[in-house]
Amino acid sequence: MTDIHAQDLAARYIALWSEPDAELRRRAIEELWAEGGAHILQPPQEIREIAAGLGFDSTTLQAHGYDELDVRVTRSYERFVAPGQFTFQARDGAVRLHDVVKLNWEMVPVGGGEAVGGGLEVLVLDENGRITTDYMFPGI
C-alpha cells in the first residue's frame, strides 16, 4: 500500500469540504476517492428519530461514485461554508491502522472560536491509498 501519513490525509480530506471552487472540489474528490468509492453517513440522532418516525427502516445516507460524492460535498459546502460563517478543520490525532484511517474534524467560526460541530471519520483505503469507503459520524 502507498505510504500515506494519516494527518496529511485528514488535512486534505477536510480541506475538500471547505473548498469554494467547484472544479477544485471535483478534482480533489477524484484524487482522494477510488472510482466507485462510497461516503456513508450516520445522521445525527434527531434526524434518525424523525426518519424512524416516518417509517424508514434505515436512516443511513449514502453517496456512491464521483458524481454522487460531488453532489454530497457541494451540498455540505453550500449549507455550512458558503454563507461565510463556518469552515471545517481536521483535529490533531489522525491515526492509521493498515488500510484504515480514523480522524476527527470540527466546524468552527471563520473568525475563530469554539467548535460548533464536528465528528468522527473512518476512511477505508485501497492499495493506492485512495478512499473506498468513508464512514462519517457527525456530532460532538
Regions found by a protein language model. Name each.
Residues 1-140:
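C-terminal and inter-domain tail/linker signature
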